[in-house]
Regions:
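N-terminal Rossmann-like NAD(P) cofactor-binding subdomain of oxidoreductases
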Residues: 1-200, 204-211, 337-338, 345
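Generic structural signal for well-ordered, non-membrane alpha-helical segments
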Residues: 8, 12, 115, 163-166, ...
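Predominant activation on well-ordered alpha-helical scaffold segments within soluble catalytic domains
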Residues: 16-17, 120, 171-178, 189, ...
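Glycine-rich beta-alpha junction loops
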Residues: 37-39, 136-137, 164-166, 190-197, ...
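Short, flexible turn/loop "capping" segments at secondary-structure junctions
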Residues: 152-154, 210, 247-253, 313-316
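Short, solvent-exposed beta-strand edge segments and adjacent coil->beta transition regions
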Residues: 156-157, 213-215, 252-256, 318-320
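Acidic, glycine-rich segments within the central catalytic cores of soluble metabolic enzymes
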Residues: 179, 183-250
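C-terminal active-site/capping subdomain that shapes the small-molecule cofactor and substrate pocket
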Residues: 242, 254, 258-346
């Protein structure tokens, strides 16, 4: 399996960093090329020094760049191991050398090529498959949530969406509840750290709320996770709604859902089912926390979600459930899980 990253922003860099940490020998990393419109010097600096996850040096690695006649290669070192990855600077995906590199999977992490037509440009350039690292703008061959419907993954699907970090957190929770109790209604509030789509100071934006200063406001806005959830659980159409509140932190989000069920459920029964799922069918996807933690405690957590036991509560027939997730590391791990599962498909 050979992988290319298109886009080396927050998600692209976290994907690389995560893959490096997974490997016993980083020289065997299957990521062979990274494309981004930023200059190599800037990309190198942002990889080496990360405000959220710390420097590469703190995890025993260092990075530099080789420039041979204008061909840039990112070198990452860990002890006596060296990973080498081509750095490209091509704004048009159709012109990327995916055929030359024999790329199997492009992880599309720019946030810009989220329509089928634009993602298809990678296929025209010679890649076998594309995983869009975001909720799609229109249709794709499959929207995949690990732990729920990843059984649909196949090398016959040209364009796949990894939906969003919030969808990867929300759907396993809803799937578990629906399977055991039957969901009657779901209202979700996504409390999300600031993203690159927001403004540092008040400035023009298509969303007038996101136009306001990110570090100075709690900003209500839409959440793509509702539409994406319906791609995986279409029978919830008309039963689910929700929105996002962006808050001035740099990482980790939580979902706060209020649900009603098709049958009578007790609080103890609900907690038991979620805890059991976290230890069995969703062991690497969902964790269950019983400690009094706050958002920064979940930085670096590899799960899609961590259910907070203390904030599962009941009022009448309605239940409230809160779950945390590292919106960068958790999501990066799911994208890599998709790549590995595709690699093992016949």
């Amino acid at each position: 399996m050979l992988i290319a990253l298109n886009g080396f922003g927050r998600i692209g860099r976290t994907v690389l960093r995560t893959y490096l940490q997974r490997l016993d020998d980083i020289s065997k990393i299957p990521i062979v090329a990274i494309n981004d419109v930023a200059d190599p010097k800037t990309l190198l600096h942002l990889l080496n020094f990360d405000s959220t996850h710390g420097s590469l040096a703190k995890i025993g690695m260092s990075a530099d760049i080789e420039n041979t006649d204008g061909v840039f290669v990112l070198r990452i070192c860990r002890k006596n191991q060296i990973a080498k990855i081509f750095l490209l600077n091509e704004p048009d995906p159709q012109k990327l050398p995916w055929k030359v590199f024999k790329i199997n999977i492009v992880l599309e992490c720019t946030g810009h090529f989220r329509s089928y037509k634009k993602a298809n440009l990678h296929l025209k350039a010679g890649a076998k498959q594309v995983i869009i690292g975001a909720a799609p703008f229109d249709y794709v061959d499959a929207c995949v949530v690990m732990g729920v419907n990843d059984n649909v993954l196949s090398k016959k699907l040209p364009i796949i969406s990894g939906v969003s970090c919030t969808t990867q957190a929300l759907v396993p929770l809803l799937f578990t509840l629906d399977h055991v109790f039957g969901l009657n209604s779901v209202l979700m509030t996504e409390i999300h750290a600031t993203t690159a789509d927001q403004m540092v100071l008040d400035q023009a934006h298509r969303d007038l709320r996101r136009a306001r200063a990110a570090g100075h406001n709690m900003i209500p806005t839409t959440s793509s996770s509702i539409k994406a959830t319906l791609q995986v659980m279409p029978h919830l159409d008309g039963k689910i709604n929700g929105y996002s509140i962006r808050v001035p932190t740099i990482n980790v989000a939580c979902i706060d859902i209020t649900v009603t069920f098709d049958r009578y459920v007790t609080l103890d029964e609900l907690k038991t089912q979620l805890k059991t799922a976290s230890q069995t069918s969703l062991k690497s996807i969902m964790a269950y926390n019983e400690l009094p933690l706050v958002s920064s405690d979940f930085i670096g957590d590899t799960h899609s979600l961590v259910v907070d036991d203390e904030y599962i509560m009941q009022a009448g027939t309605a239940f409230k459930i809160m779950a945390w997730y590292d919106n960068e590391v958790g999501y990066a791990n799911r994208l890599l899980d998709m790549c590995n599962k595709l690699n093992n498909c016949l």
